[in-house]
Amino acid sequence: MYKRQGPLRSGRDQFLQLLMPYQALYYHDGESAACTKFISVYNYSGLNIGGKSYFNTPTHPHVAHRDSRGRDVAYEHTEFTSGKEIRQAASNAGIGLKYDYDTTFFRFADYRTGEENAMQGAASGRTVSITHSDHYKTSFRYDPQSRTYKMQMYSRISGKFENTVDELTGKQLGFTNLLVCFAPIERYSGDSGDVQQVSYISGGDAYYFSRGAVQHGRWEKASPEHPLRVYDKTGAQMLFNRGKTYLAIVDDDEWPNFNYQ
């Protein structure tokens, strides 16, 4: 595991629901009441580290450290963890970190047969712009040499897009695949503190980018315990090229601000 991972933030159910079908460890510092409700109802406390005891839900403390990285940033952006600390927290909770599982998150091309999605007949998708909110925007540009999409994010400080760089390597992040899924997203009712709710059960339009092209399809997630599935226009499960994949769940309201070419 990496020497440093973070910043570590509080848990939200929209992330948990993506992990639940794979029995993945959910590691964070605190969580929304809605997230704890999912943990309680679906009996996921045995794989939840850093949660809250709302609804009498069992908890397991996380292990982390503070590092401002020499920057003037808000306190909530200074908490980090590491492979060693994650293993320690899991050991403290009696949670094993190894088990057999042969299912992947997406349907990736089989490396044993040399299979790939050549994106034949697909429309051009060499640049992609995604808007989540007024200040949360990402853009990608396809680099044919590395066959990856290089990532940029909008900076409120500079007022422009800047390269998204891995702090440990100094290199710009690049992805073999991009998947953009549109979904109804709205604030939980009541005093939720602006915690957002993703209506996964609604499904929606999906855009798969790879090799500088795009395929339009549909995604589905029948319940929190069901995996997210992506289908092409023929109804077949979308074939993903092997490699690092960026997943964006985008509010239907931001559809007009989504563009690619």
Question: Where do the protein language model's features map onto the residues?
Answer:
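A surface/extracellular/periplasmic glyco- and lipid-processing/surface-interacting theme
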Residues: 3-261
